[in-house]
Structures are given as structure tokens and as C-alpha cells.
Amino acid sequence: MVTTNKNIEEKYIRTVDEVTRNELGKEVNINLVFLSKEKIKKINREFRNINSETDVLTFVYGDDDLFAEIYLCEDVIEENAKKFSNTYEKELLMVLIHAALHCSGYDHEYDKTNAKKMFDLQERYYEKYLKKYGMDNV
């Protein structure tokens, strides 16, 4: 169990490792950081020039030995879950898969061809892990 406001089960965190290993064929050292709305907004503004909160930000460093930082905002994830009529756990799973694909080199902001591939992969992984975790009928 990862201790946050929501006490997130480790299986969700392991999903990031599994997706990056599958996509890259190697291990990525990943730090997960849970932030308040204010802090994630500040980082979003500083690094992306976007002055708003977001659910996740991913930063990848290095070429051969990859290291990544994934910043998550539980409050925004919770809001998005309600907005999309989803459970918190399903929304978290989607966000973590999205971040894992960024860690694996996929981008959706600057490359539209890559964006389609990324979102197709995201959906496939999401369906796979929903089934794996018995969440596909919830």
C-alpha cells in the first residue's frame, strides 16, 4: 500500500513499471510524487507555460539509464473521475498508464502521428489492466 490521501494499492504503481518494461524492454527508475493542486499548477506553469492544475506531469531524464519523475495530483484525478463518471481507481489507472507511455518516449502534444499511437496503446493497456485487476465490470 502506498500511503497518500487515498492509500493507493501497490498494483497500480506496479502498472507503470510493467508498461515501461514492455514498451522499452528495460527498467526505468521512476519517482512518483503526489502534489497538491497548488504545487502541480506551479510546476505546470514553470515547465509547460500552462497556468492550471493537471492530473499528471511526467519528466524523463537520460538516454541509456532512464530516470523519470511522475507528478500526480489526487484532487484533480478525483475531479476527473467524477467528470467522466469513473471510479477514482480507474481514473488513476488511466493516468498511470498515460504517464508510463510518456516514460517510454511517447508524446501527444507535438507529434500527431505519435499521439494516435500513444492513445491507442493507452486504451489497450487500460483494457488489459482493467481485466487483470477485475475492474472491467465495475
From Swiss-Prot:
Cofactor descriptive note: Binds 1 zinc ion.
GO biological process, one term: rRNA processing
InterPro entries assigned: MetalPrtase_cat_dom_sf_prd, YbeY
GO cellular component, one term: cytoplasm
Keyword line: Cytoplasm, Endonuclease, Hydrolase, Metal-binding, Nuclease, Ribosome biogenesis, rRNA processing, Zinc
Highest taxon, organism lineage: Bacteria
Predominant subcellular localization, coarse grouping: cytoplasm
One Pfam entry name: YbeY
Localization in the cell: Cytoplasm
Cofactor: Zn(2+)
Enzyme Commission designation: 3.1.-.-
Function (record text): Single strand-specific metallo-endoribonuclease involved in late-stage 70S ribosome quality control and in maturation of the 3' terminus of the 16S rRNA.
Protein family according to the UniProt entry: Belongs to the endoribonuclease YbeY family.
Name of the protein in question: Endoribonuclease YbeY
Organism of this sequence: Thermosipho melanesiensis (strain DSM 12029 / CIP 104789 / BI429)
Gene: ybeY
